[in-house]
A protein has these predicted regions:
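A short, glycine/Asx- and small/polar-enriched loop/turn
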Residues: 54-60
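Flexible, glycine-/basic-rich loop-and-beta segments that form/coincide
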Residues: 58, 65-85
């Protein structure tokens, strides 16, 4: 799944359309992770979209599965995790 924080942030997003605050990016990711988890879909990996495909906003690819089968489940991330991706 592609998470585009600029669409998850809502009215907090400035006129530039760029999500610059790591806390806002973290909330966007956690909102999607929480929604998926509540519906029995589990995140097992998160990474950023490579720079050459990025249009100024940092976007995230998340691997979701219905049955984790012993894989580590990611239920939430913190802003330090997001900054270091």
């Amino acid at each position: 799944v592609l998470i585009k924080p600029q669409f998850e942030t809502g009215k907090k997003l400035g006129k530039s359309g760029i999500v610059v605050n790591p806390e806002d990016r973290t909330k966007a990711i956690n909102d999607v992770l929480g929604f998926a988890y509540a519906h029995g879909i589990f995140a097992t990996a998160i990474t950023t979209v490579p720079d050459n495909f990025r249009n100024k906003n940092i976007e995230y690819l998340v691997h979701f599965v219905k049955r984790p089968g012993g894989k580590r489940i990611i239920r939430a991330v913190d802003s330090d995790f997001v900054k270091n991706l």
